[in-house]
């Protein structure tokens, strides 16, 4: 079965941002920002389910891992880095990994997102195990690095979730607890 085009790649009124005035750009960004709370509200039950399983696993000594590529990976690393000072948890309770490694936080690492096996190798460096939870982050829901990591984690009995901005994506189908904000 051929996968449909990700929602993030469908035609939209934003295909030609370069033709908009600064005022039009700002107005459109602001209008899109206004839609976020409603879109989040629509998936609150899914968010709750994922959080419940993460909390249960952490109570058993488990950790939360994020994997992503590009901006999605950076957001996972950012969230993980904020957990110790904000919530007083240890540095190894929430771990963010980005395709291409730490170098990719500041510079693009071309094609790192296309390696379906690298995420699992990266996760093994942290001794990921069955008490842990892996959350894949990919706006399109099609990033091979993230999908490969989720699939390998599931094969090894690790609970998986995802955050994506495309409905019925390969990533959402591979995850046990998908969150699709569309």
Describe the role of every protein-language-model region:
Residues 1-39, 43:
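Cofactor-/ligand-binding subdomain signature composed of acidic, glycine-rich
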Residues 8-11, 48-52, 63:
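Short, positively charged patches
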Residues 17-21, 46, 111-118:
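Short secondary-structure boundary/capping elements
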Residues 32, 60-61, 174:
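Structured helix-beta-strand junction loops
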Residues 37, 44, 105-109:
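Short gly/ser-rich anion-binding loops that grip negatively charged ligand groups
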Residues 42-57:
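A short, well-structured juxtamembrane/interface segment
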Residues 53, 57-65, 75:
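N-terminal glycine-rich phosphate/adenylate-binding segment common to multiple enzyme folds
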Residues 65, 69-182:
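Glycine-rich phosphate-binding loops that contact phosphosugars or nucleotide phosphates
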